[in-house]
């Protein structure tokens, strides 16, 4: 069948997707599309994503540089990698160097505030700065793990080894927060390179970190400049172009649910494995025999701030709801008061009687909503007949991310673990779901099971887990043959 170059789009032009469906080109898309641009058709949804030529070329150049740097890293010593992480951390810790980064961040924050954008994670606070430095120090002092024996099988006259090896270029699309640098550059420890796009709110800060800290640290360690590439672009099209580049070894997306799902679909249809950190919100199921003091601690410590592992839905088993709902509400109010805030409660019909007069009534579909609060903690309450119903609701409505069962017997806890469809399961507070907190390693992202279970890996993606496996044969007896 003949093929050609896409040069123009017409309003109303039908575009097939998904094998048996079509979508139409809008007048706006047709007017914007010119020769040299690219059209990405998302096969899951029919979304038509316009990638202007300039964005494609910018991304293509960055990935080309990163791929060349990846091959160059094979000749780089582990000490050089340690020197890079140490130099990066030292520059962030140097007040004179950091002053330029701080000024850029202040400008980003002012711009975001003027546009009524959230700045909760945009401000490069002293704590965020310290956490970035600490994360880089972890990578600085981590043993080299680019070539590690995983297994060995001996035969007469020969043996084979499986060995961990670097994967390639890792593409990131991050939300607008500065601390992602420490996460993204962690892949260099295992011999990989990185290309990333950061949310436009934090782009000025990202440019400053690159020029004041990353680039000098790469140069001082004699590492290729392409080992860490920032895509200097504000358009979402840069992210689409990056994830549609089949030369990536892995695509990692962090941000809002829809945008992350769309990016993941783009990556997968181009043959790129994807790790998606999208919709979050943890669930807590409260058994009738739950200890009130333990329950109060679990709730309070799960609502200290809004991140992906914050308590979002609380399921109370009916037999204990009247006794334990006040404990949940009081603990939630306590967490809110520590922030100078108030607790916002959403109640499914079954929970209206125990949720308090100020509760906001919601349909059952609200169980699938992650409350993206900034200041006032928000939770949804639902009353269920038993733990089995709570599991059923979680598996139907949640993003299948994190769940805890408070109380219950050992049999209840095991059944909960066996039947709940989540990568993270516990019996206490939900905020433990974090790579640094749980595994002492800076994380690149956390994945839910909303799009299915993950092949051969856990829900925490760290720099140490980005690798492939090679097999090497050693022949002693060269008479060996098949």
Predicted regions, residues:
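C-terminal segments
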Residues: 2-51, 57-67, 400, 408-482
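ALDH superfamily catalytic-core signature
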Residues: 96, 175-176, 183-193, 209-220, ...
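A structured beta-alpha segment of the ubiquitous adenosine-cofactor-binding alpha/beta core
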Residues: 113, 125, 155, 159-160, ...
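Conserved small-residue-rich beta-alpha loop and adjacent elements
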Residues: 134, 138-217, 221, 260, ...
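NAD(P)-dependent aldehyde/semialdehyde dehydrogenase
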Residues: 319-420, 424-442, 453, 457
